């Protein structure tokens, strides 16, 4: 496992800075996007977009039912074929994409052919990561081909907790991180996994996870003991005022833990991507991190369903093309901002700061000999 960087945390101000630095290493944000200046220059010059990475949702089945699931209205049995996944990999690598992330939909390790796809992507030269709830780690054999794994710290809130079999990573050069989602105010939740009001209730069941202070403290103790960086997030599919309340609750809980055990070294609050209001409806994420979903289509990003109005599912307005049309779609995006820019009015955009950064890159300005 890669060595984890430790930061000094002698003052609250220093801790906040360190928290932000670590957070920007383990999540999508504009600081990371700035590491890909070649992509931004291509967009500025009207060249064909070359996404930095792409997400792939191999399957929709999941062995958990979480209260915060942003795909609660998905078709539960849907999954990509081996041929579809290989075709997407072929086309994106031909476009110059170098990174791939397996994610949900459902729990990616439940796809029966995931090992085959990991090996295929590895042999194509892709750097690959995976977001998993961590309950089926022993099911996968090709962990040595992965660059990183992000474990969902959801066991701690389940009525029947499960074990994270970290021994599968022994001796491997793979970065292990974690993610936790705090979901307060469940009594006002609109998530179908809480209300039972799915668009289609086939194969659906109600959430069983519970949010208690003691569970949260156990989770913090675990990631600190295991020395695993853990981003602590919140359920964003709510009224922004309630989201802010959840953020404040997380801060209080972290404060209680630190009063007893000292400053956290590995867990950190991931609130720097939360932006209450967007500058405009401009969207460029298909040029950064498009998502191949289980229905065989490619979408603008993996997170449009985080906006409450999108009803916990992927919607047609965010569709770019089907898998076989990836190359043709990106070849059609040459010509600058007026060709490439999309307009989506998501009330919550996880990538609002990145979109604003690209907006600024594309903004025409005079006297550019000066800065």
Q: Where do the language-model regions lie?
A:
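Asparagine-centered polar/low-complexity signal
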Residues: 60-63, 133, 186, 310
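A short local loop/turn or secondary-structure capping micro-motif enriched for an aromatic residue
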Residues: 75-80, 306-311
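N-terminal pre-core extensions flanking Radical SAM catalytic domains
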Residues: 1-76, 93, 287-289, 297, ...
């Amino acid at each position: 496992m890669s060595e984890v960087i430790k930061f000094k945390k002698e003052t609250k101000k220093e801790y906040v800075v360190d928290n932000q630095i670590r957070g920007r290493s383990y999540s999508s944000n504009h600081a990371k996007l700035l590491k890909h200046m070649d992509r931004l220059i291509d967009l500025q010059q009207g060249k064909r977009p070359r996404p930095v990475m792409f997400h792939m949702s191999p399957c929709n089945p999941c062995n958990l039912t979480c209260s915060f699931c942003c795909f609660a209205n998905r078709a539960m049995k849907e999954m990509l074929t081996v041929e579809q996944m290989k075709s997407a990999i072929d086309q994106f690598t031909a476009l110059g994409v170098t990174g791939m992330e397996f994610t949900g939909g459902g729990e990616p390790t439940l796809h029966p052919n995931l090992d085959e796809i990991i090996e295929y992507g590895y042999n194509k030269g892709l750097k690959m990561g995976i977001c998993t709830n961590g309950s089926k780690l022993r099911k996968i054999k090709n962990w040595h081909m992965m660059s990183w794994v992000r474990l969902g710290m959801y066991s701690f809130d389940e009525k029947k907790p499960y074990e994270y079999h970290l021994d599968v990573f022994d001796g491997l050069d793979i970065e292990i991180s974690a993610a936790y989602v705090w979901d307060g105010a469940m009594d006002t939740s609109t998530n179908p996994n809480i209300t039972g009001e799915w668009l289609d209730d086939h194969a659906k069941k109600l959430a069983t996870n519970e949010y208690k202070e003691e569970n949260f403290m156990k989770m913090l103790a675990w990631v600190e003991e295991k020395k695993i960086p853990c981003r602590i997030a919140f359920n964003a599919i709510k009224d922004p005022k309630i989201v802010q309340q959840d953020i404040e609750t997380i801060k209080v809980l972290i404060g209680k833990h630190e009063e007893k055990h000292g400053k956290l070294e590995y867990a950190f609050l991931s609130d720097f991507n939360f932006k209450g209001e967007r500058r405009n409806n401009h969207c460029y994420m298909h040029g950064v991190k498009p998502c191949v979903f289980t229905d065989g289509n490619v979408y603008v990003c993996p997170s449009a369903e985080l906006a409450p109005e999108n009803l916990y599912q992927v919607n047609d307005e965010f569709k770019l093309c089907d898998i076989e049309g990836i190359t043709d779609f990106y070849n059609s995006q040459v010509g600058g901002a007026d060709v490439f820019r999309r307009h989506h009015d998501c009330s919550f955009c996880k990538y609002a700061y990145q979109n604003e950064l690209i907006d600024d890159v594309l903004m025409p300005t005079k006297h550019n000999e000066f800065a």
